[in-house]
Design a protein with these regions (language model features):
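Peripheral, non-AAA+ core regions of ATP-driven protein-machinery
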Residues: 1-218, 222, 228, 331, ...
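Basic, amphipathic alpha-helical bundle interface domains used for macromolecular binding and assembly
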Residues: 34-45, 60, 67-77, 289-290, ...
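Catalytic P-loop NTPase motifs of RecA-like helicase/translocase cores
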Residues: 111, 305-312, 355
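Conserved alpha-helical scaffold flanking the Walker A/P-loop in AAA+ ATPase domains
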Residues: 208, 265, 270, 280-303, ...
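Walker A/P-loop
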Residues: 219-260
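Conserved inter-motif catalytic segment of the P-loop NTP-binding fold
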Residues: 245-279, 286-287, 393, 434-444, ...
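Walker B catalytic acidic pair
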Residues: 300, 306-307, 318
Length: 514
């Protein structure tokens, strides 16, 4: 006898349909799984066998052949356990073959209970696009899968395979799961507040500019000056995630297996802070299953690299593609996968190896050549992709004990949202597709958008020739100046906007001369 069920697999960031075919024929009792299965899929036969018996069903004592189509695409993971069990039941006559518009996902425990699987949201989105009307998933994945449902597709949560069988037989229907209400603004309540940061007005201003324009930031300062505090508070003044951004971010976290059980969409902008010992593969992603790395996990959020020069040169060079293109391609012998990596980079570093070069009270123990060598670990091409650089001085005692309140995240966020509203209106015009903030402007768009007063243009010309700026640095200065002007509500870039943008140039602050 023969039966076919519908399931889905993962290829990069997207799902693809998989037909689970089961054929039971005469011959010696055996189970064969074909269709390019990996070891986890091949092992599913043993899980299905044990679960089926423990649920009280009969295992067919005949030859069973399972085919996962299309046969030329590799199948990975335990997501096919549930459809395999149902296909065996249908082919052996213990269950009617489910309708063609019904699909199944889920890993089996040996007692027949269902365990959550990774990548449910991209597979559920593909299911809805493929015309599936009913999707059965493990109960812990239901909230995530329901985000792809709506009126066209219902998502049914199940704790055991027995519940799925009873629902298909009409014995005990399963109530469908409704999507969780989307409330990204609530995420602000779980981020530390900027009012905790004492003094550092220049660095605070740089973080506001970064949030308003989507710019990358480098913080340079001795230990204890507040670099990490500022970085961890940046998500609290960023605009809330749009639903489109939330879906994209949730897909990445789901594929990486980092979605908490029972969660719908990710509502908070990610904040990722990998250790400086992280390898290039940890940042870029990879492995046999093409898992996303830290660059992709920080998509639509903040990637914080503390102790920047301590990262290996190979790891830092990985950042160049996502910083420029907003995506990263992971290539292996089995193929390649491209993941979105549109993050804001916030990097922090000490001024030297000992951390006290230029400190007003503590002596630096590094020689000039040691300072130069330490800072040279950050390459020029990477610095050229950082829009804002701030040197942070130690906090004075009086500032630490000042009773004057610092601006809160809510106050800074109002400034950021006002500037983002100006940009949203500006980039709603034709010709700016995919541009949401000033940092995303192309070179051609910079020329059209960043109009200057005559005095500002003369200042930029003098700076370009004196500082020996590259074309990329020229455009980044204009993007920052455009953000400064947006924060001030100015239509044209004036001298003040350009001067503030120029003072944040990273190249000159990192490359010391003695």
């Amino acid at each position: 006898m023969y039966a076919v069920l519908k399931s889905f697999g993962l290829r990069g960031l997207n799902g693809f349909p998989v037909e689970v075919e089961a054929d039971i024929s005469g011959g010696m009792p055996a189970l064969s799984i074909v269709g390019l299965p990996d070891s986890a899929v091949r092992e599913s036969g043993d899980r299905v066998h044990a679960a089926l018996k423990n649920l009280g069903f009969k295992w067919p004592d005949r030859r069973i052949t399972i085919n996962l189509a299309p046969a030329d695409v590799r199948k990975t993971g335990p997501v096919y356990d549930l459809p395999l069990l149902l296909a065996v039941l249908a082919a052996s006559g213990q269950l009617e073959t489910p309708p063609k518009d019904t699909a199944f996902l889920g890993e089996l425990a040996l007692d027949g209970s269902l365990r959550p699987v990774s990548g449910v949201l991209p597979m559920a989105l593909e299911a809805a696009a493929s015309g599936v009307r009913a999707l059965y998933v493990p109960a812990e994945n239901a909230a995530e899968a329901a985000e792809a449902g709506g009126s066209e597709m219902q998502v049914f949560p199940a704790a055991t395979a027995r519940q799925v069988v009873d629902a298909l037989r009409g014995v005990q229907p399963i109530p469908p799961t409704a999507p969780v209400p989307f409330d990204p603004a609530d995420a602000w309540n779980h981020v530390p507040d900027f009012s905790d940061v004492c003094s550092q007005p220049l660095a605070r201003r740089a973080m506001v500019i970064a949030a308003a324009g989507g710019h990358n930031v480098l913080l340079i300062g001795a230990p204890g000056t507040g670099k990490s505090m500022l970085a961890r508070r940046l998500p609290g003044i960023l605009p809330p995630l749009s639903r489109e951004e939330a879906v994209e971010t949730t897909k990445i976290y789901s594929i990486a297996g980092q979605m908490p059980a029972g969660r719908g969409l990710v509502t908070a902008r990610p904040f990722r802070s990998p250790h400086h010992s992280a390898s290039s593969a940890a940042l870029a992603g990879g492995g046999a299953l093409f898992r996303p790395g830290e660059c992709s996990l920080a998509n639509c959020g903040v990637l914080f690299l503390d102790e920047l020069p301590e990262f290996s040169r190979e790891s830092l060079e990985v950042l160049r593609q996502p910083l420029e293109d907003g995506c990263i391609t992971v290539s292996r012998a089995a193929g390649s996968a491209t993941y979105p990596s549109r993050f804001q980079l916030v990097a922090a570093m000490n001024p030297c190896k000992c951390g006290y070069y230029g400190h007003p009270t503590r002596a630096c123990t590094c020689s000039p050549s040691a300072v130069r060598q330490y800072r040279s670990r950050v390459s020029g091409p990477l610095l050229d992709r950082i829009d804002l650089c701030v040197e942070m001085d130690p906090v004075a005692f009086d500032e630490l004990h000042s009773v004057s309140p610092s601006e809160s995240s809510a106050e800074l966020r109002r400034q950021v949202l006002a500037a983002r509203a100006i940009q949203a209106q500006r980039y709603a015009a034709p010709g700016y597709e995919g541009v949401h903030c000033n940092a995303q402007l192309t070179a051609g768009q910079v020329r059209r958008i960043c109009r200057m007063t005559p005095a500002a243009e003369q200042l930029l010309r003098a700076s370009y020739e004196t500082l020996g700026l590259s074309a990329r640095a020229h455009d980044r200065i204009l993007r920052v100046a455009r953000t400064v002007a947006d924060l001030a509500g100015k239509r044209l870039l004036d001298e003040d906007s350009l001067l503030e943008a120029l003072q944040y140039r990273a190249q000159e602050k990192v490359e010391l001369t003695f």
